[in-house]
From Swiss-Prot:
It comes from the Viruses. It comes from African swine fever virus (isolate Tick/Malawi/Lil 20-1/1983). Belongs to the Bcl-2 family. It is found in: Host mitochondrion; Host endoplasmic reticulum. The lineage of its organism: Viruses, Varidnaviria, Bamfordvirae, Nucleocytoviricota, Pokkesviricetes. A motif (BH1) lies at residues 76-95. Suppresses apoptosis in host cell to promote the viral replication. Has the ability to potentially bind to all the members of the proapoptotic Bcl-2 family. Inhibits autophagy by interacting with host Beclin 1 (BECN1). InterPro entries: Bcl-2-like_sf, Bcl-2_BH1-3, Bcl-2_fam, Bcl2-like, Bcl2_BH1_motif_CS, Bcl2_BH2_motif_CS. One of its GO terms (biological process) is regulation of apoptotic process. This is Apoptosis regulator Bcl-2 homolog. Keywords: Apoptosis, Early protein, Host endoplasmic reticulum, Host mitochondrion, Host-virus interaction, Inhibition of host apoptosis by viral BCL2-like protein, Late protein, Modulation of host cell apoptosis by virus.
Length: 179
C-alpha cells in the first residue's frame, strides 16, 4: 500500500478493526492506542444501550450468509444518511456480529471483519474524510449526549429489524415506545 491508501487503511484499522478485536477479547484495553481508548468509551456506551433494548441474534453458518446479512443491514442503515452516530452503530453491529461468530466457534469472524472493513472503505470513508476524519469522530465521541446515542440506537434497531424481518424485535421496540 502506498500514500493515500495507507492512510485510509490506518484510519479504518484505528476506528473499526481495533474496536472489533477489543470487543472479541482478542486484545486488551491496554493494547488500544490512546485514540482507540477514547472512542471505545462511546462505542461501549452504544453497545450498552443497544444491549438494554434488544438481544441481537444471528443465524450464520457460512461466509456468504454473513456477507448477505451484514451488507443488507448496513446498506439499509446508511441508505438515506451517513452521520457519526450511525457509524458508531455500524461499528458496534460489526463487533457484535464478529463476536457472535467467534463464540459460535464457526471461524467466520474474519469474514465479518473483512466485510465491515470493505464496507467502511468503499461506502463510509469518503464521507468520514470530508467531515473531519478521525479528529471529528473523536470530537463526536467525546461530546455525544445520551439523547443522540438513544436516537441513533433506535434508528439502527428499526433498520436492523426491518431488514431481518424480526417481528418479535419490532414488537418489543414498539412496546417500549422506541419506534
Amino acid at each position: 500500500m502506498e500514500g493515500e491508501e495507507l492512510i485510509y487503511h490506518n484510519i479504518i484499522n484505528e476506528i473499526l478493526v481495533g474496536y472489533i478485536k477489543y470487543y472479541m477479547n482478542d486484545i486488551s484495553e491496554h493494547e488500544l492506542s490512546p485514540y482507540q481508548q477514547q472512542i471505545k468509551k462511546i462505542l461501549t456506551y452504544y453497545d450498552e444501550c443497544l444491549n438494554k433494548q434488544v438481544t441481537i441474534t444471528f443465524s450464520l453458518t457460512n461466509a456468504q450468509e454473513i456477507k448477505t446479512q451484514f451488507t443488507g443491514v448496513v446498506t439499509e442503515l446508511f441508505k438515506d444518511l451517513i452521520n457519526w452516530g450511525r457509524i458508531c452503530g455500524f461499528i458496534v453491529f460489526s463487533a457484535r456480529m464478529a463476536k457472535y461468530c467467534k463464540d459460535a466457534n464457526n471461524h467466520l469472524e474474519s469474514t465479518v471483519i473483512t466485510t465491515a472493513y470493505n464496507f467502511m472503505k468503499h461506502n463510509l470513508l469518503p464521507w468520514m474524510i470530508s467531515h473531519g476524519g478521525q479528529e471529528e469522530f473523536l470530537a463526536f465521541s467525546l461530546h455525544s449526549d445520551i439523547y443522540s446515542v438513544i436516537f441513533n440506537i433506535k434508528y439502527f434497531l428499526s433498520k436492523f429489524c426491518n431488514h431481518m424481518f424480526l417481528r418479535s424485535c419490532v414488537q418489543l421496540l414498539r412496546n417500549c415506545n422506541l419506534i
